[in-house]
């Protein structure tokens, strides 16, 4: 992968205690229960506010928050002026306007619910907040990919993981594709196979 350049990634981890069914993904019920137990909504607002006003004084080039439910996104818009929400229900023209304003810096934070994991082109983006747990390596990698793309105006990509995904999958810099023969590949992190089937 000589064509792939990884930039410095700063990672913060806040683990959650969740349950899953059929090893597919976490249940909505267990996620909501845990969010309410620890006041995840307030915690998320606090983290995003801190990211917007870093001690270094250097502003981020946009903060993209990945949420599981609309409630987290709505809490951000109520608490942080200028925050916008993008979801599957957002009309295409409105979504395009929001993303245009996000890229120009008019909108500092976009909270998105189940969208923008693929097909969103903004290489300058330097901060994502993963405010949803997942058992899906593919989803995790797609989301992380929003912040690790190199750009001349970007010194570092920040992956702020609030749900223990890094603990599950390892740091992005440790992910490796391993050829198992016959064109079958698997994803490994620190010698541990993460994908249950080779692809």
Predicted regions and their residues:
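Conserved interdomain linker/interface between the two RecA-like ATPase lobes of SF2 helicase motors
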Residues: 1-64, 183-188
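Short glycine-/polar-rich loops that comprise or flank the Walker A/P-loop
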Residues: 4-8, 81-82, 123-127, 153-158
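Amphipathic alpha-helical transducer elements in NTP-driven molecular machines
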Residues: 41-42, 96, 113, 122, ...
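Conserved helicase ATPase core of P-loop NTP-dependent helicases/translocases
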Residues: 64, 72-118
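SF2 helicase motor core recognition
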Residues: 109-129, 145-149
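Conserved segment of the helicase C-terminal RecA-like domain
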Residues: 138-142, 146-177
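Non-catalytic terminal extensions of ATP-dependent helicases
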Residues: 184, 188-199
